[in-house]
């Protein structure tokens, strides 16, 4: 697993800025594909949550308004008008490569790539191009990212999340909601919740996600929601050990009962032999002193025990 995290890349500064400074929590976000059925629905929901969306991009519809938001033909026009560094991409998969490249060329630093069914070759091209340009991609096939009670970019519902000091990183969208709901119900609010994405190629993998928060004083603990398939969790366990990651970590792994060599839901959720199996992940997490919950409701129980130690 390749990991490249620029130490100068501060996801919180880009998403919300610094508390006390002008514009805190109101960083501008551009929505690509805003006027499509998918993009328009979630633009309304993001705006209602508090996300500052001053512009959207739909080629051929420049000059129009949607929900009192200006529509531009190109990303360069939208970025010039707003100064945005964040893009939420809601275009259909066949248009993703062009849309993402245009965003990066326009100076966008954080791309939230929501669409599923992105060809692996296209995802790799965007990932490599983003790294060369000093940008970061979340996704593809991600529910997005949310700073609870401040802003969100993506498709997640608002109800499960509450502000706090726990971070949730998840390979599954719905399980990110479920785990966060259980954490909230037991009084463990979230500082950040980020969907890694369910595809084999991740713009920001688990190790890179951990690096984004490891030195932050406002992050007390991390919950990582994994699933069968691939070796992301095994690599993460080794990272926790080798870098002496000291923040408390709790894990949940979906798909424990899944049959081997059968894809379950996500393109990345497939087990070959013992490679990518739940047993392999649990074993490696145990070596890293990471408790693994058997169900989402058990996550806050394990977190409480971990924090008491």
Regions of interest found by a model, annotated:
Residues 2-309:
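Catalytic-core regions of core metabolic enzymes
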């Amino acid at each position: 697993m390749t990991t490249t995290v620029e130490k100068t890349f501060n996801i919180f500064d880009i998403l919300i800025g610094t508390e006390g400074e002008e514009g805190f929590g109101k960083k501008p976000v551009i929505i690509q594909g805003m006027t499509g059925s998918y993009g328009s629905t979630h633009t309304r929901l993001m705006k209602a949550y508090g996300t500052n969306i001053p512009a959207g991009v739909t080629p051929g519809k420049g000059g129009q308004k949607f929900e009192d938001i200006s529509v531009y033909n190109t990303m360069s026009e939208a970025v010039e008008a707003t100064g945005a560094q964040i893009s939420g991409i809601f275009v259909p998969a066949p248009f993703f490569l062009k849309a993402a490249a245009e965003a990066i060329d326009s100076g966008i630093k954080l791309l939230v790539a929501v669409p599923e069914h992105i060809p692996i070759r296209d995802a790799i091209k965007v990932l490599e191009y983003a790294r060369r340009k000093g940008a970061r991609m979340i996704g593809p096939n991600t529910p997005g990212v949310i700073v609870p009670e401040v802003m969100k970019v993506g498709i997640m519902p608002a109800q499960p999340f509450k502000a706090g000091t726990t971070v949730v990183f998840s390979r599954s969208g719905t399980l990110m909601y479920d785990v966060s709901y259980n954490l909230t119900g037991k009084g463990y609010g979230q500082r950040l919740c980020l969907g890694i994405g369910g595809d084999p190629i991740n713009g920001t993998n688990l190790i890179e996600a951990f690096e984004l928060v490891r030195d932050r004083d406002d992050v007390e603990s991390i919950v990582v929601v994994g699933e069968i398939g691939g070796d992301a969790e095994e690599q993460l366990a080794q990272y926790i050990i080798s870098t002496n990651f000291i923040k408390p970590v709790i894990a949940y792994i979906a798909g424990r009962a899944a049959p081997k060599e059968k894809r379950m839901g996500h393109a990345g959720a497939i087990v070959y032999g013992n490679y990518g199996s739940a047993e392999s992940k649990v074993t490696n997490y145990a070596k890293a002193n990471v408790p693994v919950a058997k169900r989402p409701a058990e996550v806050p129980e394990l977190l409480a025990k971990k924090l008491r130690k």
